[in-house]
Amino acid sequence: MRRTGLRFLLPYMRPYRRDLLVGSLYAMIGAGASAYSPTLLGRAIDALLAGITPQHLLAYAAGIVGLAVTVAIFRYLLRMLTGAIAAGVSYRMSQDLFETMLGFDQATLRQYGVGDLLSRASSDFIYIWRFYSAGFQMSLHAILLLVIGCALMALTSPPLALIVFLLLALSVALQFGLGPGVERSFDRVQQEMGRIAAFTQEHLSAARMVAAYGQERAAVAAFGAVNDVYARRGLGFAMRSAVVSSLPGLVVKLAAALVLGLGGAYVISGQITPGEYVQFIVYLSVLNGAAQNLAGAFERLQQGGAAAGRIGEVLRRRPAVADAPNAVSLTSVRGALRFENVGVRNEGRWALHEISLNIPAGSTLGIVGATGAGKSTLLGLVARVRDPDEGRVSLDGHDLRALRLESLRRSLAYVPQETLLFSMSLRDNITFGVPGLPDERVHAAVDAARLSNDLPQLPQGLATVVGERGATLSGGQRQRTAIARALARDPQLLLLDDALSSVDASTAAEIIASLATDTAPRTRLVVSQRLASVRDADQIIVLDA
């Protein structure tokens, strides 16, 4: 997963190659200054023991302070640079992810679950951000500091440096060996987080029904079961991560014990000076910090790789319905539809089979039938929510699959069974997709949908914010708002999928009459359980499950 995830990240890093080179330079300067500080301190101690003037001692002190300031400046510059890279990469990736998810069909959405996709689009991006910002900065600085530090130690005492190097190499090898297990554990944690998000989203959406059936305790118990699995996964990840993150500190302390003993013997025998001995001790302290930072960066690498793998899995999914390479746009649409031996399979069975229809432009087709007979599927074919498995559907003589999706969907309005409104004003919901619509068009659509009488009851009329999914409106008001939104587009194709099921019979009759007297050259496909809603249609078909 990590390798796949990191390969997926590479294209997003290419625009920042120059920044990465500059960041490497910043890290090299900062690491070099940090690594040279113990050397300067050791020389100052040796000079002090040999007897130097206060002016020389002050020069050493100024040099150490100057190195510390240099480290701070270049670490700051590196952190700012990597933060900017993280922001840019996260922005591009989140845009791509959102665009990809909007193109998913219902089958793909059901496969992942909305909650899981929300988890990938939110919490996974936190780990991508941490990888690019803190993880990259920490790992680059720590690796350079370890390399430069070991090189400077080797110039002072190769045997002591070899001990430190071998122990650090052992630590890194153990981290990489245990890393895949940590990543798999983290991936399982993220999967369970997706399950929690899905469970929460589903039950909050149905909160009123849960309360109406008195199932609050059962829902809490069910959430507890899901949460328990998440907690156990999280504990497993924490234990594995703790083992990996504690290795560098343990190794450096072991190296310190060996250097203290062996280095002391070297001082006594005169192989190294007291200043060089102190220099080694300080180096171990510096390398300990670098090793701890490297462990933290390695953890971010594991988490970022797993998160990138989960996001990449979604981005690699191609939509089931997409533009053909040679797709064309229609400059004008009359609205003549034709179904030719159309068949659609759902889970191995025919939802529609051998359907042939000819719907003249400007006519109305009424569609009735039992639940599960394929009425919604039929409308979905016109909107290209999905494509037929057999036969073809054509608009004005053009196979729908040969048309650009944008061109097709610009010419139609689709009101599905489940009314979906956004948490914005009623007017913004009605003008969704047609910004800047004149007031006359808005009020005409409101009148046709018989929504005018409801406006005085709303606190701010058309400016009233309807809440998430239109929660502040009744079911009938939501459906009529959706119809007004469809009419505001002035489409050539109007698809109504049982769009009046929550509207009372008299108001529904008024809306049907309004649509029947509509003089716009519009082709209408109306699905309804009420025969009264389709009795004036030019054609009526009955679908049998």
Q: What is each model feature region?
A:
Residues L330-A545:
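ABC-type nucleotide-binding domain
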Residues G63-R75, L168-V172, S241-A255, P274-E299:
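Hydrophobic alpha-helical segments in the permease module
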Residues Q215, M239, V286-V314:
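Cytosolic ends of transmembrane helices, especially the final helix of ABC transmembrane type-1 domains
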Residues L10, R17, Q106-A107, S123-Y132, ...:
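An intracellular "coupling" helix at the cytosolic face of ABC transporter transmembrane type-1 domains
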Residues M80-A84, G88, R92, L155, ...:
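Cytoplasmic juxtamembrane "membrane-exit" helices immediately C-terminal to transmembrane segments
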Residues A87, Q95-S119, S123-Y127, A198-A222, ...:
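Short intracellular "coupling" helices and adjacent cytoplasmic loop segments at the cytosolic face
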Residues P15, D19-G32, A134-R188, V259-T273, ...:
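Transmembrane helices of ABC transporter permease
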